[in-house]
From Swiss-Prot:
Pathway: Fermentation; pyruvate fermentation to lactate; (S)-lactate from pyruvate: step 1/1. Its EC number is 1.1.1.27. The lineage of its organism: Eukaryota, Metazoa, Chordata, Craniata, Vertebrata. It comes from Oryctolagus cuniculus (Rabbit). GO terms for molecular function: L-lactate dehydrogenase activity. This is L-lactate dehydrogenase B chain. Its main location: cytoplasm. Coiled coil: none annotated. NAD(+) binds at N22. GO terms for cellular component: mitochondrial inner membrane. It is a peripheral membrane protein. Disulfide bonds: none annotated.
Length: 217
C-alpha cells in the first residue's frame, strides 16, 4: 500500500479510492493518510455487504421482498458491527416499536440470530432462494454504480467519523453515506439510541488503539 497508493494519486490525481481489503476500516484510514486525498474521496466498502445480507435475512424472516425491508448494519466491519434495531422498519413501521425487546436476549422473535448470521456469513457467501449472492464483488459494483451514474444513493460505507456521535479520534467506521460522482458527499446523521451510540464509540476506541501505533503515515 505504501508504494501503490502514492502512485495511484500521482497518475490519477482526481481519483476516488474504494478500499475493500480487510481489516477494511483500518486500511481505509491508512489509504487516506498515505494518499493525502480529501476524506470524501477515500471510501471503505465497510458494512455495505453486511447491510445487504441483513436485509435479505430480514426479508426471509418476514416474507417481504428485501428491497422493502429497511435496516442498517453500522460501525466497524468486524465482530462488533452494530445492528441498528431502532431503525429497522417496513413501510415506515418500526419493528422495535411493535417488539420493544427486538435484538435483545429476551426477544421472543429471536432477531439476535439474524445479526449473528450476518456476522458469521461475512466469511462465506449466503445463498438465498431466488436471489443472486451478494458477494463482495457485487457489493463493490453497487458502490461504483452509485458514483459512476451520479445516483446519490445512500450506502453504509466506511468514512472518517471524527466529530460524529462524540467520537474524537480519526477513525473510519460505516455510517449511511451519500455516494455520487463527487465521491462521498455527506453522512446521514441517524438518530441512534444511547446504547447504539455507546457501541459505535466502543468500535472507535478499538480501532484507534490499533491505529495509534501505526508508524510512517
Amino acid at each position: 500500500g505504501k508504494f501503490i497508493i502514492p502512485q495511484i494519486v500521482k497518475y490519477s490525481p482526481n481519483c476516488i479510492i474504494i478500499v475493500v481489503s480487510n481489516p477494511v476500516d483500518i486500511l481505509t484510514y491508512v489509504t487516506w493518510k498515505l494518499s493525502g486525498l480529501p476524506k470524501h474521496r477515500v471510501i471503505g466498502s465497510g458494512c455495505n455487504l453486511d447491510s445487504a445480507r441483513f436485509r435479505y435475512l430480514m426479508a426471509e424472516k418476514l416474507g417481504i421482498h428485501p428491497s422493502s425491508c429497511h435496516g442498517w448494519i453500522l460501525g466497524e466491519h468486524g465482530d462488533s458491527r452494530l445492528a441498528v434495531w431502532s431503525g429497522v422498519n417496513v413501510a415506515g413501521v418500526s419493528l422495535q416499536e411493535l417488539n420493544p425487546e427486538m435484538g435483545t436476549d429476551n426477544d421472543s422473535e429471536n432477531w439476535k440470530e439474524v445479526h449473528k448470521m450476518v456476522v458469521e456469513s461475512a466469511y462465506e457467501v449466503i445463498k438465498l432462494k431466488g436471489y443472486t449472492n451478494w458477494a463482495i464483488g457485487l457489493s463493490v459494483a453497487d458502490l461504483i454504480e452509485s458514483m459512476l451514474k451520479n445516483l446519490s444513493r445512500i450506502h453504509p460505507v466506511s468514512t472518517m467519523v471524527r466529530g460524529m456521535y462524540g467520537i474524537e479520534s480519526e477513525v473510519f467506521l460505516s455510517l449511511p453515506c451519500i455516494l455520487n460522482a463527487r465521491g462521498l458527499t455527506s453522512v446521514i446523521n441517524q438518530k441512534l439510541k444511547d446504547d447504539e451510540v455507546a457501541q459505535l464509540k466502543k468500535s472507535a476506541d478499538t480501532l484507534w488503539d490499533i491505529q495509534k501505533d501505526l508508524k510512517d503515515l
